[in-house]
C-alpha cells in the first residue's frame, strides 16, 4: 500500500470478508460483477485457453496478452478512438496484461473455516482469546465433537457421542438411532454448533475490553496470594499469570488495530493473482504448474461438493455434511500451511506440496529472497580479518573486490585523463591490471566511503561507513574496536561491502554512519568501541612483565642472574654486563628493541622527566634499598622506580622500572589523546 506521504510500505494482518470482496470484485462495463472463482479448472486441454470462472479466468484476472480478449480480437489500449474496451462476447476487458500480477479473486466457502495460523501456531491466538485448551478447540474445529449453544450465557463443551449412560438395555440402540433421523437435523441446527462456525460464534460474542478488565483482576488476585509452599502449584500459578499477560496484550492489539476477532475465521478465501502461481509450458506439450494451483483446485473441489450436499440437506445425512466440512477445513489448512497438522500432503511422485507459508517464509521465501535479501549491484562479500595498522574509521579492501566495486569510476577516470578512448579499451586496461589503474583507483577511493554490513542487522550499528584502503589478499581488514557494534569476531565471519552512489547517500554515510562517530550504544548509551577478545589478549601480552626471577630483579638491579641482557655489551648506551639497561628516552628503548638488543618483556630503567609525576608518592613511600656512591650521591630504590639524589638530598633524576611493552602501550595512548585534542581544536 501507499500512504498519504507517498511512502511504499507493506502491512500484513487480518482483514474483513468485506475487504476481501472489495479487493477481488470488479464491475465489468456491462454491469456484471466478477471475482468469484467457482471452477477448479485452469486451461482447456484442446484450446489451451483459460477456463471461464476458473483459476486463470481472463474475465476475473484480466487478459493474458495485452489488448487481446479470449476471442482473439485486438483492441488498442488507451486509444483516443471511442472504441469499446470490452468484449461483449467473452466478457474480457481490453487492458494491460500486467493486471494479472495484482488482480485477486476469491472463493466463497460453503462453511466457515478457521485460519490455521491463528489456531495451530504457537501461541494460539484463538485459544488465548477464548481461554480454552488448544486440544478442545482442535476437536471442535475438525468436527470430533460438538458445542452446545449457550444456555443462560454459560457455554459448555459436550461430547454428544458416548455421553449417554445406557442404564436401560432397550435404549442402547434407540438413542444412537436418533442421531440419524431427520428430526435430529432440526435439533442440531438449533441447539448444536460444530466446526469453525462454533469458533466464529464464540469470537463474535467476545468483548475485548471486558477480557482486559477481568484478566487484570485475576492477575492481581494471583499476585496477592503469594507462595503456596508447593512448587508444582507455584509453577502453575506462574504459568497462569504469564497467560493472562499475553491475553491482555493480544486483546489490546486487536483494539488498537481495529481488528475483529471473528476475522480469524474465513468465509471468503482470497485467490492469488495468476502471475504469482504460473503454469509454464515446456517442450513436448508438457507444462509445469505451481503447487498452489493444485491446492486451490483441491479446495474448490471439496467446497463445491459441500455446496451440493447443503443444497440437498434434507436427504443428506448430517454425518456426511460434517465429514465434508472437515475435508474443506483440511484442504484450506494444506493450502495455507502444509504439514502443520502432521503428515504433509504429497503428490503422485511423493513430493511435498509447497504451500503458501512455504512460499513466503524462510531463507528462500518471497520476503527474504526477493524483497529483503535481494542481490544488488556495487556490492561484495568476503571474510573479515583484523587490521592492526588501520585507524578506527578505515577498512582494508582487497584489490580484487575494490576494482570490481569501483570499476565504473576507474573507467571514467581513464577516459577523462585520455588514457583510454572508449569503455572497451578502459576495461582491457583494467583486465591487464596496468599500474595506472591502481593509481586511479587510489584517487577514487580517497573521497568515496563504503558501507560494511554484517547479517543479521539487529540495530543501526550493524551497518557502518568506512574509508577504504587497498590491501593485499582476499579478506576485508577491520579495526577490532568496531567488532562489538557488528557483533563480529575473527573466526570466519563474513561481511558485505556496499558502495553508496548518490551524493545524498555519501553525505549520510560521512555525517551519520562513520565508525568513529558511533562510539556509544544507541540503546543504553554505554561505550560500544571497547577492547574485547583479541585486543584484551594483545594488551595482556604487551604489558606482561618478565616473571623469571621477579623478586631478585625487582629490588636489585645489579642481580647477576639477569641473563637475558648479556648480549648488550656493544650498545651505544651506558650498560655493564649483568645489569638491567638504562635508557634516557623511550625512543632509545624502542630502537634497542627493533635492533633485537632486548625483547618485549625485558625489564629496563627509563629516565623520567622531573616535571612529570610518578603514580606512586615518593614522599609517603619508604625506599626498599638505598645505595650510596663515592661522591656522596645516593640511589633510593623503590618498588617501581629509583630516585638519584645529590649530597644535599636534591632530586637529580628519576628512573622508572618498565618494559618495552609498557612503553609501546603508553606511546599509543599518548598519540591517540594528542590526535583527539588536535581534531577537537580544529572543530572548535
Swiss-Prot record:
Cofactor(s) required for function per UniProt: Mg(2+); Zn(2+)
Residue positions binding Mg(2+): 489, 491, 493
Amino-acid positions noted as binding Zn(2+) in the UniProt annotation, renumbered to this chain: 69, 71, 87, 90
EC assignment: 2.7.7.6
This protein's name: DNA-directed RNA polymerase subunit beta'
Gene3D superfamilies: 1.10.40.90, 2.40.40.20, RNA polymerase II, clamp domain, RNA polymerase Rpb1, domain 3
Assembly and interaction partners: In plastids the minimal PEP RNA polymerase catalytic core is composed of four subunits: alpha, beta, beta', and beta''. When a (nuclear-encoded) sigma factor is associated with the core the holoenzyme is formed, which can initiate transcription.
Chief site of localization: plastid
Entry's Gene Ontology BP terms: DNA-templated transcription
A Pfam family the protein falls into: RNA_pol_Rpb1_2
Cofactor note (record): Binds 1 Mg(2+) ion per subunit.
Function: DNA-dependent RNA polymerase catalyzes the transcription of DNA into RNA using the four ribonucleoside triphosphates as substrates.
Catalytic class of the enzyme: transferase
Amino acid at each position: 500500500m501507499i500512504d498519504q506521504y507517498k511512502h511504499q510500505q507493506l502491512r500484513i494482518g487480518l482483514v474483513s470478508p468485506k475487504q476481501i470482496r472489495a479487493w477481488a470484485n470488479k464491475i465489468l462495463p456491462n454491469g456484471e460483477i466478477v471475482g468469484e472463482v467457482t471452477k477448479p479448472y485452469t486451461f482447456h486441454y484442446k484450446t489451451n485457453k483459460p477456463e471461464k470462472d476458473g483459476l486463470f479466468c481472463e474475465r476475473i484476472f484480466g487478459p493474458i496478452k495485452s489488448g487481446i480478449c479470449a476471442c482473439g480480437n485486438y483492441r488498442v489500449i488507451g486509444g483516443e478512438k471511442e472504441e469499446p474496451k470490452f468484449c461483449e462476447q467473452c466478457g474480457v476487458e481490453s487492458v494491460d496484461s500486467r493486471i494479472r500480477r495484482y488482480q485477486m479473486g476469491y472463493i466463497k466457502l460453503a462453511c466457515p473455516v478457521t485460519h490455521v495460523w491463528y489456531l495451530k501456531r504457537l501461541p494460539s491466538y484463538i485459544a488465548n482469546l477464548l481461554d480454552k485448551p488448544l486440544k478442545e478447540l482442535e476437536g471442535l474445529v475438525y468436527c470430533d465433537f460438538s458445542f452446545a449453544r449457550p444456555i443462560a450465557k454459560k457455554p459448555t463443551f459436550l461430547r454428544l457421542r458416548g455421553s449417554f449412560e445406557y442404564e436401560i438395555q432397550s435404549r442402547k440402540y434407540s438413542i444412537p438411532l436418533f442421531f440419524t433421523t431427520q428430526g435430529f437435523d432440526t435439533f442440531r441446527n438449533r441447539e448444536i454448533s460444530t466446526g469453525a462456525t462454533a469458533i466464529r460464534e464464540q469470537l463474535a460474542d467476545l468483548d475485548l475490553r471486558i477480557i482486559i478488565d477481568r484478566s487484570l483482576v485475576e492477575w492481581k488476585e494471583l499476585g496477592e496470594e503469594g507462595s503456596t509452599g508447593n512448587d508444582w502449584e507455584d509453577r502453575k500459578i506462574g504459568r497462569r499469570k504469564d497467560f493472562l499477560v499475553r491475553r491482555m496484550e493480544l486483546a489490546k492489539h486487536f483494539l488498537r488495530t481495529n481488528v475483529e476477532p471473528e476475522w480469524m475465521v474465513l468465509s471468503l478465501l482470497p485467490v492469488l493473482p495468476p502471475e504469482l502461481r504460473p503454469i509454464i509450458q515446456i517442450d513436448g506439450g508438457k507444462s509445469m504448474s505451481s503447487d498452489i494451483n493444485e491446492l486451490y483446485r483441491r479446495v474448490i473441489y471439496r467446497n463445491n461438493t459441500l455446496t451440493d450436499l447443503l443444497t440437498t440437506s434434507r436427504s443428506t445425512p448430517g454425518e456426511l455434511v460434517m465429514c465434508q466440512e472437515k475435508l474443506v477445513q483440511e484442504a484450506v489448512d494444506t493450502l495455507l500451511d502444509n504439514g502443520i497438522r502432521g503428515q504433509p500432503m504429497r503428490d503422485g511422485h511423493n513430493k511435498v506440496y509447497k504451500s503458501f507459508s512455504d512460499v513466503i517464509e524462510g531463507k528462500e521465501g518471497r520476503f527474504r529472497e526477493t524483497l529483503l535479501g535481494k542481490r544488488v549491484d556495487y556490492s561484495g562479500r568476503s571474510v573479515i580479518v583484523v587490521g592492526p595498522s588501520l585507524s578506527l574509521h578505515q577498512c582494508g579492501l582487497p584489490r580484487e573486490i575494490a576494482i570490481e566495486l569501483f570499476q565504473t569510476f576507474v573507467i571514467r577516470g581513464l577516459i577523462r585523463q585520455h588514457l583510454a578512448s572508449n569503455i572497451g579499451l578502459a576495461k582491457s586496461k583494467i583486465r591487464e591490471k596496468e599500474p595506472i589503474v591502481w593509481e586511479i583507483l587510489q584517487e577514487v577511493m580517497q573521497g568515496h566511503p563504503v558501507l560494511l554490513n554484517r547479517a543479521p542487522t539487529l540495530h543501526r550499528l550493524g551497518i557502518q561507513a568506512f574509508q577504504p584502503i587497498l590491501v593485499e589478499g582476499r579478506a576485508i581488514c577491520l579495526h577490532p574496536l568496531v567488532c562489538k557494534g557488528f557483533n563480529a569476531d575473527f573466526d570466519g565471519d563474513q561481511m558485505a561491502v556496499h558502495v553508496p552512489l548518490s551524493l545524498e547517500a555519501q553525505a549520510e554515510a560521512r555525517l551519520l554512519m562513520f565508525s568513529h562517530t558511533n562510539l556509544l550504544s544507541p540503546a543504553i548509551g554505554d561505550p560500544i568501541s571497547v577492547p574485547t577478545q583479541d585486543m584484551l589478549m594483545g594488551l595482556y601480552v604487551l604489558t606482561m612483565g618478565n616473571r623469571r626471577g621477579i623478586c631478585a630483579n625487582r629490588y636489585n638491579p645489579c642481580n647477576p642472574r639477569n641473563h637475558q641482557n648479556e648480549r648488550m655489551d656493544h650498545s651505544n648506551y651506558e650498560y655493564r654486563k649483568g645489569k638491567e639497561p638504562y635508557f634516557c628516552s623511550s625512543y632509545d628503548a624502542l630502537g634497542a628493541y627493533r635492533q633485537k638488543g632486548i625483547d618485549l618483556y625485558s625489564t629496563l630503567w627509563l629516565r623520567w622527566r622531573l616535571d612529570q609525576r610518578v603514580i606512586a608518592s615518593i614522599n609517603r613511600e619508604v625506599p626498599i634499598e638505598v645505595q650510596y656512591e663515592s661522591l656522596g650521591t645516593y640511589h633510593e630504590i623503590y618498588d617501581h622506580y629509583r630516585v638519584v639524589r645529590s649530597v644535599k638530598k636534591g632530586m637529580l633524576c628519576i628512573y622508572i622500572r618498565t618494559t618495552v611493552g609498557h612503553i609501546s602501550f603508553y606511546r599509543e595512548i599518548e598519540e591517540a589523546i594528542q590526535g583527539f585534542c588536535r581534531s577537537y581544536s580544529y572543530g572548535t
